Amino acid sequence: MASAMYAGAQTGSNPVEDLPRAAPHAFVVGENFAGMRSQALGLAHRAVWDGTFQPVCPSRVARVALAGPRWLGRPCLRGSEGQMLESHKDLLRSDVVISVGGKGGAIGAALRAHCRPVVPIQNPRQSLARFDLLIACRHDDISGPNVLRCRTALHGLTPA
């Protein structure tokens, strides 16, 4: 039987159909190592998020500044090629930030916004309260109400 919409009958003042939606977008930050990329993009893939990887490599001074007040860390929010991350087109359209490792965690925590949660993979080596959900292996030896522990490293090769 044809749906009421196709039969010409109006089913309400604003009928809602299941329209295809674009996949949520994930802005992924971390050092440009194959294992870190694989873990972060593997999580994005399994969550059915469209992920864009942005390599970062903040200095020690930048990581200290990023752990402080927002105004102090703002100049340090740069990708590995020097571009400002706060105005990056992929960040502006993202629904979530995935960070990986300590350096990625420092950048990710600084990019956290009310409408854009941050999900780090691995121990971010800073206060876990700065993150919405953390995904860490048992060997990372962290725990808390916002920590999801897994047995092995994440990747996009096998089902969870």
Provide a role label for each language-model segment.
Residues 78-93:
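Short, well-structured alpha-helical segments in soluble
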Residues 40, 106-119:
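Glycosyltransferases and closely related glycan-assembly transferases
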Residues 103-104, 141:
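Alpha-helix capping/helix-boundary segments
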